[in-house]
Amino acid sequence: MQTVLLSHSLDHGVLVITVHQDPGIGGRATLLMRISDLVRAYRPEPVVVLLDEPAARGAVVSVVLRVHRLCSRLGTLLSVATHSAPVRRALEANADTAGTRLVVHARADTAVAAAFAAAA
């Protein structure tokens, strides 16, 4: 049985990408490619990455930080929502400060609403 790694939807003009599973170290490149392709396809829409509990791990944090750098280069707003306080702290501490700020939320609804408001 194949596990769904991620899904996406458009919510009020915000691209919402939900990462359901941790791909592990070996799956990082695939996850990065899939998210990057979505970001480029929906550009200039703001992006919210939601990390389901099983996905809130080191490999996914690394991917999100790389996606943040891509979004900064593209001028696209990126927000992340995760219930995991350690993951939120890791994202905030390691985010690239040279480009667009990475916005990290504890709740998905808050992240989408804030991204929608910022893009309006």
Model-derived features: where do they sit?
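STAS-like cytosolic regulatory interaction modules
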Residues: 1-47, 51-54, 71-120
